[in-house]
Each structure stands twice: as structure tokens, then as C-alpha cells.
Amino acid sequence: MKYRPLPFYLTIKKSKIHGLGLYSLAKIPKDTTIGMTHIEVGNDLIRTPLGGFINHSEEPNCERKLHNNRWFLKTIQDIDRNRELTLRYSMYKP
């Protein structure tokens, strides 16, 4: 399997929120796991390319889920083509 820093249905482009952001190239259904954003190593977090470009929103369309010391990005609603993926920033464990 070839490594891809981003899924084929995402791209990075200028964001209206801040700097660059993650945008959908196709419709993404609710409850889709997009990929890994961070890895916990001891008390440290290592950010992946996916985690480096998602912007904060008070009304996000994605959330983070922790599984085996890895944080994954998951959609919490359907995301239409050309829409920016957003996350409410919080690295605290639930």
C-alpha cells in the first residue's frame, strides 16, 4: 500500500478561517474516519500532515477520536464537495 499523507478525497488550499485548510474533493458521509491526526508518545504528541492543516471552528464538522495512543479525525456530519473540514480544538481526553 502506498503511503498518502492525505486521503485522495482531500486537498489543501487557502482557508477563509486561517492560512491553509483541508477541503473535500468529493462528498464525505457522516461517521467517516478520515485518518490519523496525532500520535501520543509518552507525554508528547506528534502531528501528522492531516493534523497540521485542519482549522478550528466553534461549529465543527469533524471530531477527534482516541484509539491506541492515536488520534483519528472522524466526520460528525455529511461534508459536501469543496467544503472545509473543521475541528473544535481540544487535546484533552474525554
Segment roles from a protein language model:
Residues 1-94:
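Conserved catalytic SET/PR domain of SAM-dependent protein methyltransferases, capturing the structural core
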